[in-house]
Swiss-Prot record:
InterPro entries: MCT-1/Tma20 (IPR016437), Pre-PUA (IPR041366), PUA (IPR002478), PUA-like_sf (IPR015947), Uncharacterised_CHP00451 (IPR004521). SMART domains: PUA. This is Malignant T-cell-amplified sequence 1-B. The keyword Cell cycle applies. The lineage of its organism: Eukaryota, Metazoa, Chordata, Craniata, Vertebrata.
Length: 181
C-alpha cells in the first residue's frame, strides 16, 4: 500500500476535523481495538487538533498535532501506524515470523504460512481478517502491520500460500513521512 508512497507527491489535502467527527472516529477505534479505550485520551488528547490527510488511492491518514496515528483506505477500517504501535505495542494482537522472513517482510512481501509455522516463529490464535502486529524472532518492535488472510488454525493446517497480508512495514513511504502539519 505504501511501497511507492511519497508525502510530497501523494498527499492531496489536509482537513481539520469537527468535534462530532472526532467522537465518531474515536468510537470506531474503540469498536475496532477494544484494548485502546483506556489509552485513547492519551493518544488523542481532547484539546489537540485532529486532522485527516487525504492521499492518492483513497488513503486517509489520521493525525494529531502532526503525528501520524492511524490510516485507512476507502472509508474502511483503521490501521495503526508503526510509530504508534511502537509506543503502544499492546493495541494489536501479535504474530511472530522467523529470522528468515525478516528481509522479505521489510521489502513489502506478504507473510507466507511457512514463515509463521517454522521454528522461531510463534503463531497465536487469531481469526481471519484480524489486524495484527508482525514481530520478528529476536526483535523487540513490530516490523509491520498486517491482516490475517486465514485463521491461525487454517495456517497450521494448510501451511501454504499467504497467511498475512502486509499493509504497512518499516521503511515504507508512510514510515518515512515523519509528521504532517
Amino acid at each position: 500500500m505504501f511501497k511507492k508512497f511519497d508525502d510530497k507527491e501523494n498527499v492531496s489535502n489536509c482537513i481539520q476535523l469537527k468535534t462530532s467527527v472526532i467522537k465518531g472516529i474515536k468510537n470506531q477505534l474503540i469498536d475496532q481495538f477494544p484494548v485502546i479505550e483506556q489509552w485513547l485520551n492519551q493518544i488523542m488528547p481532547k484539546k489537540d487538533p485532529v486532522k485527516i490527510v487525504r492521499c492518492h488511492e483513497h488513503i486517509e491518514i489520521l493525525t494529531v498535532n502532526g503525528e501520524l496515528l492511524f490510516f485507512r483506505q476507502r472509508e474502511g477500517s483503521f490501521y495503526p501506524t508503526l510509530r504508534l504501535l511502537h509506543k503502544y505495542p499492546f493495541i494489536l494482537p501479535h504474530q511472530q515470523v522467523d529470522k528468515g522472513a525478516i528481509k522479505f517482510v521489510l521489502s513489502g512481501a506478504n507473510i507466507m504460512c511457512p514463515g509463521l509455522t517454522s521454528p522461531g516463529a510463534k503463531l497465536y490464535p487469531a481469526a481471519a481478517e484480524t489486524v495484527v502486529a508482525i514481530m520478528a524472532e529476536g526483535k523487540q518492535h513490530a516490523l509491520c502491520v498486517g491482516v490475517m488472510k486465514m485463521s491461525a488454525d487454517d495456517i497450521e493446517k494448510v501451511n501454504k500460500g499467504i497467511g498475512i497480508e502486509n499493509i504497512h512495514y518499516l521503511n515504507d513511504g508512510l514510515w518515512h513521512m515523519k509528521t504532517y502539519k
